[in-house]
Amino acid sequence: MNKKALLLIAALLVAVTATAQTSSRWGVTLGANFNEVHFKQTDILPSEKMFGPQAGVTGEMNFGSSGFGVDGALLYTLKQGKVNYGDRVAWKSLGYGEETVAMHYIDVPLHLKFKYRRLGGAETTIMPLVFVGPQFSFLPYASHKSLNSYPPVNVYLDMGAGVELFERMQVRAGYNFSVGQSFHTKLLDDNVAKNRTWYLTLPWFLK
C-alpha cells in the first residue's frame, strides 16, 4: 500500500465523519513501543530492537449503535534502534560503533474502528475492538544526523486490537510499519531503513 492510498483512506475517514450521526469524546493516552530499525540490506548493518515511550491526547467518534467509529490522536513517540555501525570499516574508521538511533516523532494516527457491542449487557464492562488506518509521523528531532538522512514526514500503516473496560479505559495492542523510508545512511545512501513497531497503549477517556 503506497502513500497515495493511505492519504485517500484518511480523506474518506474525514468525509464519513462529517456526514454521520456521531457521538464524540476525548481523553489522554500513555504507552510504550518496541521498535525495529529494519534495513533493506540486512547483511550490511545489524540492528537490535529497542523500547520507547509514547503519550498524548486522543479522541473518538462513534456512529450510533453500529459499533463503527473513527478515532485519532496527537502523540509524542520515541522510536529507537541499536545499530552496529562498527561492523563496517566505513563507519568504524570514523570512530563509530554500536549506536542508539533515536527518532522523536509527533504522530497523528487516524483509524476506522469497530467495537463489538452485542454482549448481552457485558459490553458495559468489557468490549472488544479492532482498528486500522494511516499514521502521519512528523520528525522534529533525530540523533546521529552525521550518519543518517531523515525525511521530515513518515507515513505508516497502523492496525491493532484491544478491549474497552467500563466504557472509559481501553487497552490496545498494535503494529505499524513505515510505507516509505524512515532514514538512509549517508555513506551508503542506498541502505534504507524502515521502522517496524509493536506497541501497547492505555487510552483513558474523560467521558
Q: What are these language model-derived features?
A:
Residues 33-37, 77-83, 137-141, 176-180, ...:
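Structural signature of outer-membrane beta-barrel domains
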Residues 66-70, 120, 167-173:
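Repeated loop/turn-to-beta-strand initiation elements of outer-membrane beta-barrel proteins
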Residues 192-207:
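Outer-membrane beta-barrel "beta-signal"
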